[in-house]
Protein backbone atom coordinates (compact mmCIF):
# COMPACT_ATOMS: atom_id res chain seq x y z
CA UNK A 1 0.00 0.00 0.00
CA UNK A 2 1.40 3.42 -1.00
CA UNK A 3 1.53 6.55 1.11
CA UNK A 4 -1.66 8.44 1.91
CA UNK A 5 -0.57 12.07 1.64
CA UNK A 6 -2.06 14.94 3.66
CA UNK A 7 -3.05 18.10 1.78
CA UNK A 8 -4.14 21.46 3.17
CA UNK A 9 -5.98 22.94 0.18
CA UNK A 10 -6.01 26.57 1.31
CA UNK A 11 -7.60 29.74 -0.05
CA UNK A 12 -4.28 31.61 -0.22
CA UNK A 13 -1.64 28.90 0.23
CA UNK A 14 -1.59 25.11 0.11
CA UNK A 15 0.72 22.67 1.86
CA UNK A 16 1.52 18.95 1.67
CA UNK A 17 2.86 16.55 4.31
CA UNK A 18 3.54 12.83 4.63
CA UNK A 19 4.29 10.39 7.44
CA UNK A 20 7.93 9.31 7.33
CA UNK A 21 8.67 6.55 9.80
CA UNK A 22 6.19 7.57 12.44
CA UNK A 23 6.73 11.33 12.17
CA UNK A 24 4.99 13.85 9.88
CA UNK A 25 7.11 15.77 7.40
CA UNK A 26 6.17 18.84 5.34
CA UNK A 27 7.50 18.57 1.78
CA UNK A 28 9.15 21.36 -0.20
CA UNK A 29 7.80 22.02 -3.69
CA UNK A 30 9.90 22.34 -6.86
CA UNK A 31 10.62 26.01 -6.01
CA UNK A 32 12.03 24.96 -2.62
CA UNK A 33 9.10 26.37 -0.61
CA UNK A 34 7.12 24.54 2.11
CA UNK A 35 3.86 26.24 1.08
CA UNK A 36 2.51 26.85 -2.42
CA UNK A 37 0.40 29.89 -3.37
CA UNK A 38 -3.11 28.69 -4.36
CA UNK A 39 -2.83 30.55 -7.66
CA UNK A 40 -3.37 29.15 -11.16
CA UNK A 41 -2.54 31.00 -14.38
CA UNK A 42 -3.48 30.20 -17.97
CA UNK A 43 -0.91 31.76 -20.30
CA UNK A 44 -1.41 32.97 -23.87
CA UNK A 45 0.51 29.99 -25.28
CA UNK A 46 -1.73 27.48 -23.44
CA UNK A 47 0.56 26.68 -20.51
CA UNK A 48 -0.93 26.22 -17.01
CA UNK A 49 1.18 27.68 -14.21
CA UNK A 50 0.60 26.84 -10.54
CA UNK A 51 1.95 28.45 -7.38
CA UNK A 52 4.86 30.90 -7.38
CA UNK A 53 5.33 30.94 -11.20
CA UNK A 54 1.63 31.88 -11.56
CA UNK A 55 1.95 34.58 -8.90
CA UNK A 56 5.02 36.12 -10.58
CA UNK A 57 3.22 36.75 -13.88
CA UNK A 58 -0.10 37.89 -12.35
CA UNK A 59 0.54 41.61 -12.92
CA UNK A 60 0.85 41.16 -16.68
CA UNK A 61 -1.95 38.57 -16.96
CA UNK A 62 -4.57 39.53 -14.32
CA UNK A 63 -7.67 38.28 -16.12
CA UNK A 64 -6.31 34.75 -16.59
CA UNK A 65 -4.65 34.42 -13.17
CA UNK A 66 -7.04 32.79 -10.69
CA UNK A 67 -6.74 32.97 -6.90
CA UNK A 68 -9.01 32.46 -3.85
CA UNK A 69 -10.98 29.82 -5.80
CA UNK A 70 -11.91 28.08 -2.55
CA UNK A 71 -14.29 30.99 -1.83
CA UNK A 72 -16.35 29.94 -4.88
CA UNK A 73 -16.48 26.18 -4.32
CA UNK A 74 -20.04 24.95 -3.84
CA UNK A 75 -21.58 28.41 -4.21
CA UNK A 76 -24.33 29.82 -6.43
CA UNK A 77 -23.54 32.70 -8.79
CA UNK A 78 -26.33 34.79 -7.26
CA UNK A 79 -24.98 34.41 -3.69
CA UNK A 80 -24.32 37.80 -2.14
CA UNK A 81 -20.70 36.89 -1.34
CA UNK A 82 -20.05 35.74 -4.91
CA UNK A 83 -21.54 38.97 -6.27
CA UNK A 84 -19.19 40.91 -4.00
CA UNK A 85 -16.23 38.97 -5.43
CA UNK A 86 -17.53 39.51 -9.00
CA UNK A 87 -17.12 43.25 -8.53
CA UNK A 88 -13.58 43.16 -7.11
CA UNK A 89 -11.83 40.17 -8.71
CA UNK A 90 -9.74 40.86 -11.84
CA UNK A 91 -10.84 37.55 -13.38
CA UNK A 92 -14.32 36.77 -14.71
CA UNK A 93 -16.83 34.92 -12.48
CA UNK A 94 -19.85 33.65 -14.46
CA UNK A 95 -23.03 31.64 -13.89
CA UNK A 96 -22.94 27.99 -14.94
CA UNK A 97 -25.98 26.44 -16.62
CA UNK A 98 -27.13 25.09 -13.24
CA UNK A 99 -26.66 28.48 -11.52
CA UNK A 100 -23.37 27.65 -9.77
CA UNK A 101 -20.49 30.12 -9.69
CA UNK A 102 -17.91 29.18 -12.36
CA UNK A 103 -15.03 31.06 -13.96
CA UNK A 104 -14.35 32.08 -17.53
CA UNK A 105 -10.79 31.87 -18.81
CA UNK A 106 -9.97 32.78 -22.41
CA UNK A 107 -13.60 32.22 -23.43
CA UNK A 108 -13.90 28.83 -21.72
CA UNK A 109 -16.14 28.22 -18.67
CA UNK A 110 -14.48 26.25 -15.86
CA UNK A 111 -15.78 24.87 -12.55
CA UNK A 112 -13.97 25.70 -9.28
CA UNK A 113 -13.16 21.99 -8.56
CA UNK A 114 -11.58 21.75 -12.01
CA UNK A 115 -9.28 24.69 -11.19
CA UNK A 116 -8.54 23.54 -7.62
CA UNK A 117 -7.48 20.20 -9.13
CA UNK A 118 -4.47 21.97 -10.70
CA UNK A 119 -3.20 22.84 -7.19
CA UNK A 120 -3.80 19.27 -6.02
CA UNK A 121 -1.88 17.96 -9.05
CA UNK A 122 1.13 20.06 -8.01
CA UNK A 123 0.85 18.73 -4.44
CA UNK A 124 0.67 15.16 -5.80
CA UNK A 125 3.73 15.74 -8.04
CA UNK A 126 5.67 17.20 -5.07
CA UNK A 127 5.02 14.00 -3.09
CA UNK A 128 5.86 11.72 -6.04
CA UNK A 129 9.16 13.55 -6.68
CA UNK A 130 10.15 13.13 -3.02
CA UNK A 131 9.00 9.52 -2.60
CA UNK A 132 10.06 8.32 -6.05
CA UNK A 133 6.82 6.39 -6.50
CA UNK A 134 3.25 7.10 -7.70
CA UNK A 135 0.83 8.62 -5.18
CA UNK A 136 -2.87 7.91 -5.60
CA UNK A 137 -4.45 8.46 -2.16
CA UNK A 138 -4.89 11.56 -0.02
CA UNK A 139 -6.57 13.09 3.00
CA UNK A 140 -7.71 16.64 2.16
CA UNK A 141 -8.78 19.26 4.69
CA UNK A 142 -11.74 21.64 4.48
CA UNK A 143 -13.07 24.38 6.77
CA UNK A 144 -15.16 22.88 9.60
CA UNK A 145 -18.14 24.94 8.45
CA UNK A 146 -18.03 23.65 4.85
CA UNK A 147 -21.40 22.11 3.98
CA UNK A 148 -22.19 18.96 2.02
CA UNK A 149 -21.82 20.54 -1.44
CA UNK A 150 -18.46 22.11 -0.66
CA UNK A 151 -17.14 18.80 0.71
CA UNK A 152 -18.40 16.97 -2.38
CA UNK A 153 -16.74 19.57 -4.64
CA UNK A 154 -13.43 19.12 -2.79
CA UNK A 155 -13.61 15.36 -3.32
CA UNK A 156 -14.38 16.01 -7.01
CA UNK A 157 -11.27 18.20 -7.28
CA UNK A 158 -9.22 15.34 -5.84
CA UNK A 159 -10.68 12.89 -8.33
CA UNK A 160 -9.92 15.26 -11.23
CA UNK A 161 -6.32 15.46 -9.95
CA UNK A 162 -6.04 11.67 -9.98
CA UNK A 163 -6.38 11.21 -6.24
CA UNK A 164 -8.62 8.84 -4.33
CA UNK A 165 -9.67 11.05 -1.41
CA UNK A 166 -9.72 8.61 1.50
CA UNK A 167 -11.05 11.15 3.96
CA UNK A 168 -12.15 14.78 4.16
CA UNK A 169 -11.30 16.21 7.60
CA UNK A 170 -11.90 19.60 9.17
CA UNK A 171 -8.98 22.03 9.29
CA UNK A 172 -9.14 22.87 13.04
CA UNK A 173 -9.32 19.15 13.84
CA UNK A 174 -6.27 18.51 11.67
CA UNK A 175 -4.40 21.28 13.50
CA UNK A 176 -5.34 19.66 16.82
CA UNK A 177 -3.87 16.36 15.59
CA UNK A 178 -0.63 18.16 14.71
CA UNK A 179 -0.54 19.85 18.13
CA UNK A 180 -1.56 16.80 20.16
CA UNK A 181 0.68 14.20 18.57
CA UNK A 182 3.92 15.04 20.35
CA UNK A 183 3.09 17.84 22.78
CA UNK A 184 2.50 17.19 26.48
CA UNK A 185 0.60 14.15 27.74
CA UNK A 186 -2.58 14.00 29.80
CA UNK A 187 -6.21 14.95 29.21
CA UNK A 188 -6.91 18.52 28.09
CA UNK A 189 -9.40 20.69 26.25
CA UNK A 190 -8.09 23.03 23.56
CA UNK A 191 -9.53 25.73 21.29
CA UNK A 192 -8.36 25.90 17.67
CA UNK A 193 -8.83 29.38 16.17
CA UNK A 194 -8.35 29.06 12.40
CA UNK A 195 -8.35 32.30 10.40
CA UNK A 196 -7.07 31.55 6.92
CA UNK A 197 -7.13 33.32 3.58
CA UNK A 198 -10.84 32.92 2.97
CA UNK A 199 -12.52 31.11 5.85
CA UNK A 200 -12.76 31.21 9.64
CA UNK A 201 -13.36 28.27 12.00
CA UNK A 202 -13.32 27.73 15.74
CA UNK A 203 -13.34 24.23 17.21
CA UNK A 204 -13.36 23.13 20.84
CA UNK A 205 -11.55 19.79 21.07
CA UNK A 206 -11.03 17.40 23.97
CA UNK A 207 -7.87 15.31 23.91
CA UNK A 208 -8.05 12.18 26.09
CA UNK A 209 -4.72 10.47 26.73
CA UNK A 210 -4.98 6.99 28.23
CA UNK A 211 -1.73 5.01 28.40
CA UNK A 212 -0.43 6.73 25.27
CA UNK A 213 -3.64 6.19 23.27
CA UNK A 214 -4.99 9.58 22.25
CA UNK A 215 -8.60 10.33 21.37
CA UNK A 216 -9.33 13.68 19.72
CA UNK A 217 -13.02 14.46 20.21
CA UNK A 218 -14.54 17.62 18.72
CA UNK A 219 -17.03 19.00 21.26
CA UNK A 220 -18.31 21.92 19.16
CA UNK A 221 -17.49 23.88 16.03
CA UNK A 222 -18.58 27.19 14.55
CA UNK A 223 -17.36 29.65 11.96
CA UNK A 224 -17.81 31.78 8.88
CA UNK A 225 -17.08 30.38 5.41
CA UNK A 226 -16.55 33.79 3.83
CA UNK A 227 -14.20 35.62 6.20
CA UNK A 228 -10.42 35.57 5.93
CA UNK A 229 -7.20 37.26 4.89
CA UNK A 230 -8.60 38.14 1.45
CA UNK A 231 -11.18 40.36 3.21
CA UNK A 232 -8.40 42.04 5.21
CA UNK A 233 -6.52 42.70 1.95
CA UNK A 234 -9.69 44.16 0.38
CA UNK A 235 -10.10 46.66 3.21
CA UNK A 236 -6.54 47.91 2.72
CA UNK A 237 -6.85 47.95 -1.09
CA UNK A 238 -10.04 50.04 -0.88
CA UNK A 239 -8.32 52.48 1.47
CA UNK A 240 -5.34 52.88 -0.89
CA UNK A 241 -7.62 53.34 -3.91
CA UNK A 242 -9.69 55.98 -2.08
CA UNK A 243 -6.58 57.87 -0.93
CA UNK A 244 -5.14 57.84 -4.46
CA UNK A 245 -8.44 59.09 -5.88
CA UNK A 246 -8.50 61.94 -3.34
CA UNK A 247 -4.94 62.88 -4.25
CA UNK A 248 -4.95 62.36 -8.04
CA UNK A 249 -8.65 62.27 -8.99
CA UNK A 250 -8.25 58.87 -10.70
CA UNK A 251 -10.21 55.74 -9.70
CA UNK A 252 -7.91 52.74 -10.11
CA UNK A 253 -10.81 50.27 -9.81
CA UNK A 254 -11.33 50.48 -13.58
CA UNK A 255 -7.75 49.37 -14.31
CA UNK A 256 -7.17 45.58 -13.82
CA UNK A 257 -3.38 45.88 -14.15
CA UNK A 258 -3.19 48.61 -11.52
CA UNK A 259 -5.50 46.66 -9.19
CA UNK A 260 -3.33 43.54 -9.49
CA UNK A 261 -0.21 45.53 -8.58
CA UNK A 262 -2.15 47.10 -5.72
CA UNK A 263 -3.27 43.69 -4.44
CA UNK A 264 0.32 42.47 -4.26
CA UNK A 265 1.44 45.69 -2.55
CA UNK A 266 -1.42 45.56 -0.02
CA UNK A 267 -0.68 41.93 0.88
CA UNK A 268 3.02 42.79 1.32
CA UNK A 269 2.19 45.86 3.45
CA UNK A 270 -0.19 43.84 5.64
CA UNK A 271 2.50 41.24 6.31
CA UNK A 272 5.15 43.91 7.03
CA UNK A 273 2.84 45.64 9.51
CA UNK A 274 2.75 42.48 11.64
CA UNK A 275 6.34 43.26 12.65
CA UNK A 276 6.71 47.00 11.83
CA UNK A 277 4.71 50.03 13.00
CA UNK A 278 4.75 51.70 9.58
CA UNK A 279 5.38 50.83 5.93
CA UNK A 280 5.40 52.56 2.54
CA UNK A 281 3.27 51.51 -0.41
CA UNK A 282 5.38 52.73 -3.31
CA UNK A 283 4.07 51.95 -6.82
CA UNK A 284 5.67 54.05 -9.58
CA UNK A 285 3.80 54.44 -12.87
CA UNK A 286 0.62 52.95 -11.38
CA UNK A 287 -1.43 54.75 -14.05
CA UNK A 288 -1.40 57.79 -16.34
CA UNK A 289 -3.67 60.55 -17.62
CA UNK A 290 -3.34 63.44 -20.08
CA UNK A 291 -0.77 65.15 -17.85
CA UNK A 292 1.53 62.13 -17.74
CA UNK A 293 2.32 59.12 -15.52
CA UNK A 294 1.07 58.89 -11.93
CA UNK A 295 2.85 57.28 -8.98
CA UNK A 296 1.48 55.98 -5.70
CA UNK A 297 3.51 56.69 -2.58
CA UNK A 298 1.51 56.28 0.63
CA UNK A 299 2.49 55.64 4.22
CA UNK A 300 0.37 53.10 6.12
CA UNK A 301 0.68 52.66 9.88
CA UNK A 302 -0.21 49.56 11.87
CA UNK A 303 -2.81 51.64 13.73
CA UNK A 304 -4.46 52.60 10.41
CA UNK A 305 -4.56 49.00 9.21
CA UNK A 306 -6.03 47.88 12.54
CA UNK A 307 -8.75 50.54 12.34
CA UNK A 308 -9.66 49.26 8.83
CA UNK A 309 -9.95 45.60 9.85
CA UNK A 310 -11.02 45.68 13.52
CA UNK A 311 -14.65 44.99 12.58
CA UNK A 312 -13.53 41.84 10.70
CA UNK A 313 -11.57 40.59 13.72
CA UNK A 314 -14.54 41.31 16.01
CA UNK A 315 -16.73 39.20 13.71
CA UNK A 316 -14.69 36.15 14.74
CA UNK A 317 -15.56 36.57 18.43
CA UNK A 318 -19.28 35.69 18.26
CA UNK A 319 -18.60 32.17 16.87
CA UNK A 320 -16.17 31.66 19.80
CA UNK A 321 -18.97 32.37 22.29
CA UNK A 322 -21.42 30.07 20.45
CA UNK A 323 -18.87 27.21 20.24
CA UNK A 324 -18.09 27.42 23.97
CA UNK A 325 -21.81 27.51 24.79
CA UNK A 326 -22.50 24.50 22.55
CA UNK A 327 -19.65 22.60 24.23
CA UNK A 328 -21.05 23.50 27.67
CA UNK A 329 -17.73 25.08 28.68
CA UNK A 330 -16.37 28.44 29.80
CA UNK A 331 -13.05 30.08 28.84
CA UNK A 332 -11.50 28.84 32.11
CA UNK A 333 -11.96 25.22 30.90
CA UNK A 334 -9.69 25.80 27.88
CA UNK A 335 -6.11 24.70 28.62
CA UNK A 336 -4.48 25.74 25.34
CA UNK A 337 -5.36 28.00 22.42
CA UNK A 338 -3.94 27.08 19.00
CA UNK A 339 -3.76 29.66 16.20
CA UNK A 340 -3.95 28.37 12.63
CA UNK A 341 -3.87 30.25 9.31
CA UNK A 342 -1.51 32.99 8.15
CA UNK A 343 -3.88 35.80 9.17
CA UNK A 344 -3.39 34.86 12.85
CA UNK A 345 0.12 36.36 12.65
CA UNK A 346 -1.52 39.80 12.83
CA UNK A 347 -0.88 41.30 16.32
CA UNK A 348 -4.47 42.60 16.56
CA UNK A 349 -5.86 39.08 15.99
CA UNK A 350 -3.53 37.65 18.64
CA UNK A 351 -4.51 40.39 21.11
CA UNK A 352 -8.26 39.84 20.62
CA UNK A 353 -7.87 36.07 21.05
CA UNK A 354 -5.70 36.55 24.15
CA UNK A 355 -8.24 38.97 25.65
CA UNK A 356 -11.12 36.58 24.93
CA UNK A 357 -9.55 33.43 26.41
CA UNK A 358 -7.52 35.19 29.10
CA UNK A 359 -4.36 33.37 28.03
CA UNK A 360 -1.63 33.64 25.39
CA UNK A 361 -2.01 31.30 22.40
CA UNK A 362 0.63 28.60 21.92
CA UNK A 363 3.62 29.75 19.89
CA UNK A 364 4.98 26.27 19.08
CA UNK A 365 2.47 25.41 16.34
CA UNK A 366 3.29 26.61 12.82
CA UNK A 367 0.05 28.24 11.58
CA UNK A 368 0.92 27.58 7.92
CA UNK A 369 1.85 23.90 8.28
CA UNK A 370 -0.22 22.50 11.17
CA UNK A 371 -3.26 21.62 9.05
CA UNK A 372 -1.27 19.68 6.43
CA UNK A 373 0.62 17.85 9.20
CA UNK A 374 -2.70 16.86 10.80
CA UNK A 375 -3.99 15.62 7.43
CA UNK A 376 -0.84 13.50 7.06
CA UNK A 377 -1.37 12.08 10.57
CA UNK A 378 -4.93 11.08 9.62
CA UNK A 379 -3.55 9.55 6.42
CA UNK A 380 -1.07 7.62 8.57
CA UNK A 381 -3.90 6.39 10.80
CA UNK A 382 -5.87 5.17 7.75
CA UNK A 383 -2.77 3.48 6.29
CA UNK A 384 -1.87 1.87 9.62
CA UNK A 385 1.41 3.82 9.94
CA UNK A 386 0.22 5.78 12.99
CA UNK A 387 -1.15 3.85 15.96
CA UNK A 388 -2.98 4.91 19.11
CA UNK A 389 -4.80 7.90 17.57
CA UNK A 390 -8.59 8.12 17.26
CA UNK A 391 -10.33 11.12 15.70
CA UNK A 392 -13.99 11.93 16.49
CA UNK A 393 -15.26 14.84 14.37
CA UNK A 394 -18.72 16.47 14.29
CA UNK A 395 -21.38 17.78 11.90
CA UNK A 396 -21.61 21.61 12.13
CA UNK A 397 -25.40 22.11 11.69
CA UNK A 398 -28.56 20.18 12.61
CA UNK A 399 -30.15 17.97 9.95
CA UNK A 400 -33.83 17.01 9.77
CA UNK A 401 -37.01 16.90 7.70
CA UNK A 402 -40.11 19.05 7.29
CA UNK A 403 -43.10 17.74 9.24
CA UNK A 404 -46.73 18.73 9.80
CA UNK A 405 -47.34 22.45 10.04
CA UNK A 406 -44.08 23.43 8.32
CA UNK A 407 -41.89 22.47 11.30
CA UNK A 408 -38.26 21.36 10.99
CA UNK A 409 -37.96 18.09 12.96
CA UNK A 410 -34.23 17.40 13.59
CA UNK A 411 -32.94 13.85 13.28
CA UNK A 412 -29.30 14.72 13.92
CA UNK A 413 -28.39 17.68 16.16
CA UNK A 414 -25.48 20.03 15.38
CA UNK A 415 -22.12 19.02 16.90
CA UNK A 416 -23.07 15.31 16.77
CA UNK A 417 -20.00 13.07 16.44
CA UNK A 418 -19.65 11.53 12.98
CA UNK A 419 -20.00 9.02 11.43
CA UNK A 420 -23.54 8.67 12.79
CA UNK A 421 -26.89 7.14 11.90
CA UNK A 422 -30.33 7.98 13.26
CA UNK A 423 -33.83 6.75 12.41
CA UNK A 424 -37.27 8.02 13.38
CA UNK A 425 -40.76 6.80 12.48
CA UNK A 426 -43.18 9.28 10.91
CA UNK A 427 -46.68 8.82 9.52
CA UNK A 428 -49.18 10.27 7.06
CA UNK A 429 -51.37 13.32 7.65
CA UNK A 430 -54.25 12.35 5.34
CA UNK A 431 -56.44 9.28 5.00
CA UNK A 432 -55.38 6.90 2.19
CA UNK A 433 -52.25 8.96 1.44
CA UNK A 434 -50.24 6.90 -1.07
CA UNK A 435 -47.07 9.00 -1.33
CA UNK A 436 -44.94 11.32 0.79
CA UNK A 437 -42.19 13.78 -0.11
CA UNK A 438 -39.20 13.72 2.22
CA UNK A 439 -37.88 17.31 2.39
CA UNK A 440 -34.36 17.35 3.90
CA UNK A 441 -33.29 20.49 5.80
CA UNK A 442 -30.12 21.83 7.45
CA UNK A 443 -30.15 24.53 10.12
CA UNK A 444 -31.22 25.52 13.62
CA UNK A 445 -34.64 27.18 13.13
CA UNK A 446 -38.05 25.66 13.98
CA UNK A 447 -39.83 26.96 10.87
CA UNK A 448 -38.76 24.79 7.94
CA UNK A 449 -38.65 27.74 5.52
CA UNK A 450 -36.01 29.46 7.69
CA UNK A 451 -33.55 26.59 7.16
CA UNK A 452 -31.42 25.52 4.21
CA UNK A 453 -33.19 23.08 1.87
CA UNK A 454 -30.75 20.30 0.91
CA UNK A 455 -33.10 18.38 -1.36
CA UNK A 456 -36.21 16.20 -1.49
CA UNK A 457 -37.39 12.86 -2.81
CA UNK A 458 -40.66 10.91 -3.03
CA UNK A 459 -41.65 7.63 -1.41
CA UNK A 460 -44.74 6.27 -3.17
CA UNK A 461 -46.68 3.02 -3.11
CA UNK A 462 -47.73 3.44 0.53
CA UNK A 463 -50.60 1.06 1.37
CA UNK A 464 -53.93 2.94 1.73
CA UNK A 465 -54.82 3.43 5.41
CA UNK A 466 -56.23 5.91 7.91
CA UNK A 467 -53.94 8.86 8.62
CA UNK A 468 -51.44 8.16 11.38
CA UNK A 469 -51.49 4.41 10.65
CA UNK A 470 -48.65 3.90 8.08
CA UNK A 471 -45.19 3.74 9.60
CA UNK A 472 -42.54 5.47 7.50
CA UNK A 473 -39.02 5.07 8.86
CA UNK A 474 -36.70 7.92 7.85
CA UNK A 475 -32.97 7.26 8.34
CA UNK A 476 -30.17 9.85 8.22
CA UNK A 477 -26.66 8.47 7.81
CA UNK A 478 -23.62 10.81 7.85
CA UNK A 479 -20.34 9.25 6.77
CA UNK A 480 -16.87 10.11 8.08
CA UNK A 481 -16.50 12.82 5.39
CA UNK A 482 -19.62 14.57 6.72
CA UNK A 483 -21.65 13.66 3.62
CA UNK A 484 -25.33 12.84 4.18
CA UNK A 485 -27.30 9.81 2.95
CA UNK A 486 -31.08 9.66 3.55
CA UNK A 487 -33.53 6.78 3.18
CA UNK A 488 -37.28 6.40 3.75
CA UNK A 489 -39.01 3.03 4.16
CA UNK A 490 -42.68 2.10 4.42
CA UNK A 491 -42.52 -0.57 7.15
CA UNK A 492 -45.75 -2.19 5.95
CA UNK A 493 -45.02 -2.61 2.24
CA UNK A 494 -41.23 -2.67 2.55
CA UNK A 495 -40.87 -0.05 -0.21
CA UNK A 496 -37.71 2.03 0.26
CA UNK A 497 -36.17 5.08 -1.39
CA UNK A 498 -32.58 6.29 -0.84
CA UNK A 499 -30.68 9.43 -1.77
CA UNK A 500 -27.21 10.86 -1.24
CA UNK A 501 -27.85 14.51 -0.57
CA UNK A 502 -26.26 16.80 -3.14
CA UNK A 503 -27.36 20.30 -2.33
CA UNK A 504 -27.97 22.61 -5.29
CA UNK A 505 -25.51 25.11 -3.83
CA UNK A 506 -23.17 25.68 -0.93
CA UNK A 507 -24.31 27.37 2.24
CA UNK A 508 -22.99 30.88 2.01
CA UNK A 509 -21.57 32.76 4.99
CA UNK A 510 -24.73 34.80 5.49
CA UNK A 511 -27.00 31.75 5.43
CA UNK A 512 -24.99 29.75 7.96
CA UNK A 513 -24.39 32.65 10.33
CA UNK A 514 -28.06 33.59 10.14
CA UNK A 515 -29.18 30.05 10.91
CA UNK A 516 -27.25 29.74 14.15
CA UNK A 517 -27.29 33.34 15.37
CA UNK A 518 -30.94 33.98 14.48
CA UNK A 519 -31.88 30.73 16.15
CA UNK A 520 -30.53 32.19 19.40
CA UNK A 521 -31.66 35.78 18.86
CA UNK A 522 -35.12 34.64 17.81
CA UNK A 523 -35.54 31.83 20.32
CA UNK A 524 -38.71 33.48 21.65
CA UNK A 525 -40.36 33.76 18.21
CA UNK A 526 -39.34 30.15 17.52
CA UNK A 527 -41.01 29.03 20.75
CA UNK A 528 -44.19 30.93 19.83
CA UNK A 529 -44.21 29.40 16.35
CA UNK A 530 -43.71 25.90 17.77
CA UNK A 531 -46.59 26.43 20.23
CA UNK A 532 -48.80 27.74 17.40
CA UNK A 533 -48.07 24.67 15.27
CA UNK A 534 -48.83 22.34 18.20
CA UNK A 535 -52.18 24.10 18.70
CA UNK A 536 -52.91 23.87 14.95
CA UNK A 537 -52.12 20.15 14.99
CA UNK A 538 -54.39 19.61 18.03
CA UNK A 539 -57.17 21.57 16.29
CA UNK A 540 -56.68 19.57 13.10
CA UNK A 541 -56.94 16.33 15.08
CA UNK A 542 -60.10 17.61 16.81
CA UNK A 543 -61.66 18.54 13.45
CA UNK A 544 -60.86 15.14 11.99
CA UNK A 545 -62.17 13.09 14.95
CA UNK A 546 -65.31 15.24 15.39
CA UNK A 547 -66.23 14.93 11.70
CA UNK A 548 -65.75 11.16 11.88
CA UNK A 549 -67.93 10.91 15.02
CA UNK A 550 -70.56 13.14 13.36
CA UNK A 551 -70.61 10.85 10.34
CA UNK A 552 -70.84 7.70 12.49
CA UNK A 553 -73.64 9.15 14.68
CA UNK A 554 -75.95 9.57 11.68
CA UNK A 555 -79.56 10.31 12.64
CA UNK A 556 -79.01 9.44 16.33
CA UNK A 557 -77.95 13.08 16.95
CA UNK A 558 -80.68 15.78 17.28
CA UNK A 559 -80.76 18.18 14.30
CA UNK A 560 -80.08 21.28 16.47
CA UNK A 561 -76.95 19.70 17.96
CA UNK A 562 -75.77 18.65 14.50
CA UNK A 563 -76.20 22.20 13.12
CA UNK A 564 -74.34 23.73 16.11
CA UNK A 565 -71.44 21.28 15.69
CA UNK A 566 -71.23 21.91 11.94
CA UNK A 567 -71.09 25.70 12.56
CA UNK A 568 -68.36 25.23 15.19
CA UNK A 569 -66.40 22.98 12.80
CA UNK A 570 -66.62 25.63 10.09
CA UNK A 571 -65.46 28.38 12.51
CA UNK A 572 -62.47 26.32 13.66
CA UNK A 573 -61.55 25.41 10.08
CA UNK A 574 -61.58 29.13 9.14
CA UNK A 575 -59.11 30.21 11.87
CA UNK A 576 -56.89 27.12 11.61
CA UNK A 577 -54.43 28.59 9.10
CA UNK A 578 -54.22 31.94 10.91
CA UNK A 579 -51.44 33.12 13.22
CA UNK A 580 -53.67 33.75 16.29
CA UNK A 581 -53.09 30.86 18.73
CA UNK A 582 -55.65 32.20 21.25
CA UNK A 583 -58.35 32.40 18.56
CA UNK A 584 -57.72 28.78 17.51
CA UNK A 585 -57.89 27.64 21.15
CA UNK A 586 -61.16 29.57 21.68
CA UNK A 587 -62.76 27.95 18.62
CA UNK A 588 -61.56 24.53 19.81
CA UNK A 589 -63.23 25.10 23.19
CA UNK A 590 -66.43 26.22 21.46
CA UNK A 591 -66.45 23.01 19.40
CA UNK A 592 -65.83 20.85 22.48
CA UNK A 593 -68.69 22.59 24.35
CA UNK A 594 -71.29 21.97 21.63
CA UNK A 595 -70.11 18.38 21.08
CA UNK A 596 -71.31 17.04 24.46
CA UNK A 597 -74.31 15.20 23.02
CA UNK A 598 -72.15 13.84 20.17
CA UNK A 599 -69.69 12.39 22.68
CA UNK A 600 -72.53 10.62 24.52
CA UNK A 601 -73.76 9.06 21.27
CA UNK A 602 -70.21 8.00 20.32
CA UNK A 603 -69.68 6.34 23.74
CA UNK A 604 -73.00 4.50 23.49
CA UNK A 605 -72.05 3.21 20.05
CA UNK A 606 -68.62 2.14 21.30
CA UNK A 607 -70.11 0.26 24.27
CA UNK A 608 -72.63 -1.38 21.99
CA UNK A 609 -69.78 -2.53 19.78
CA UNK A 610 -68.04 -3.84 22.93
CA UNK A 611 -64.66 -2.21 22.30
CA UNK A 612 -64.55 -0.55 25.75
CA UNK A 613 -63.48 2.94 24.64
CA UNK A 614 -63.76 5.39 21.79
CA UNK A 615 -60.08 6.21 21.73
CA UNK A 616 -58.69 2.71 21.20
CA UNK A 617 -57.74 3.40 17.62
CA UNK A 618 -55.79 6.47 18.61
CA UNK A 619 -53.41 4.45 20.78
CA UNK A 620 -51.63 3.12 17.73
CA UNK A 621 -50.38 6.62 16.94
CA UNK A 622 -48.72 7.33 20.30
CA UNK A 623 -45.17 6.59 19.21
CA UNK A 624 -45.56 8.13 15.78
CA UNK A 625 -44.82 11.76 14.89
CA UNK A 626 -47.53 13.32 12.70
CA UNK A 627 -45.97 14.34 9.41
CA UNK A 628 -47.44 16.26 6.55
CA UNK A 629 -45.78 15.82 3.19
CA UNK A 630 -46.57 17.62 0.01
CA UNK A 631 -45.62 16.15 -3.32
CA UNK A 632 -43.56 18.67 -5.24
CA UNK A 633 -42.85 18.27 -8.93
CA UNK A 634 -39.12 18.47 -9.64
CA UNK A 635 -38.18 21.63 -11.44
CA UNK A 636 -36.50 20.76 -14.66
Curated annotation (Swiss-Prot):
Q: Which residues carry this modification: Phosphothreonine?
A: 199
Species of origin reads: Sodalis glossinidius (strain morsitans)
Q: Which residues form the signal peptide?
A: none
Question: What InterPro entries does the record point to?
Answer: ATPase_NBD, Chaperone_DnaK, Heat_shock_70_CS, HSP70_C_sf, HSP70_peptide-bd_sf, Hsp_70_fam
Q: What is the annotated role of this protein in its UniProt record? A: Acts as a chaperone.
Name a GO molecular-function annotation. ATP-dependent protein folding chaperone
Q: Where is this region: Disordered?
A: 606-636
Instruction: Give the family, as the similarity comment puts it.
Output: Belongs to the heat shock protein 70 family.
User: Pfam families this protein is in?
Assistant: HSP70 (PF00012)
Which signals induce this protein?
By stress conditions e.g. heat shock.
Q: What is this protein called?
A: Chaperone protein DnaK
Q: Which gene encodes it?
A: dnaK
Which keywords describe this protein according to UniProt? ATP-binding, Chaperone, Nucleotide-binding, Phosphoprotein, Stress response
